[in-house]
Amino acid sequence: FVNEIEDLSNYTKPVALTFDDCFVYFYNNAYPLLKKYNQKASIYIICNYVNGPNYLTTDQIKEMVDSGLVSVQTHTLSHRELTSLSLEEMEKELVESKKYLDSTYNINVDTICYPIGKYNDTIVNKAKEIYKYGLAMTGGVYNSKKHEFMQIGVWLLISLQIIWNSQMLK
């Protein structure tokens, strides 16, 4: 979980396993490996996609939360690019997705993964009111005192590669 590597001085080469969008392939391929190797990961849920075709179901998410191996965090309500939304729409994406996840899964969401990796000062300032962490899909680590809000760069991996690798490890 991202919150478990907050103090990087405790680690020489920390790794956080994160998965965006809540595709069912995570449950079918990655989750069994997490159980097999007793490893933790965070998934970033697009709330409006839960129970949709090719996406995780509420029951699957509850099972993973209950396992203690999967931390559920938000990827907003609809995965719309936040920088293109009005202030009201952006706030709704941030606030309502947390409310939904917190109440549905009896958790405390503290991390947002910005859709499409795009954010600006307005989005970060609003996110700081709601979340402890903000993640973006970037090419490296973002660690700036400018926002005084922990933001972590996430490297994009191709989903098919993850699935292929999971088959090789079985």
Predicted regions and their residues:
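C-terminal active-site subregion of NodB/CE4 polysaccharide deacetylases
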Residues: F1-T18, V24-N29, S67, S84-K170
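Histidine-centered catalytic micro-motifs
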Residues: F19, S71-H79
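Acidic (Asp/Glu)-rich catalytic clusters
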Residues: Y31-Q39, L56-T74, K128, N143-H147
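Juxtamembrane helix-loop-helix connectors linking adjacent transmembrane helices
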Residues: K40-V50, N54, T58
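Short beta-strand and adjacent tight-turn residues that come in two discontinuous sequence segments
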Residues: Y44, H75, A136-M137
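Short histidine/acidic/glycine/proline-rich micro-motifs that form metal-
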Residues: C47-N51, E81, P115-K118
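Hydrophobic pocket-lining residues within nucleotide cofactor-binding pockets
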Residues: V50, L77, L82-L85, L157
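Charged helix-capping and loop-helix junction motifs
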Residues: N54-Q60, E88-E93
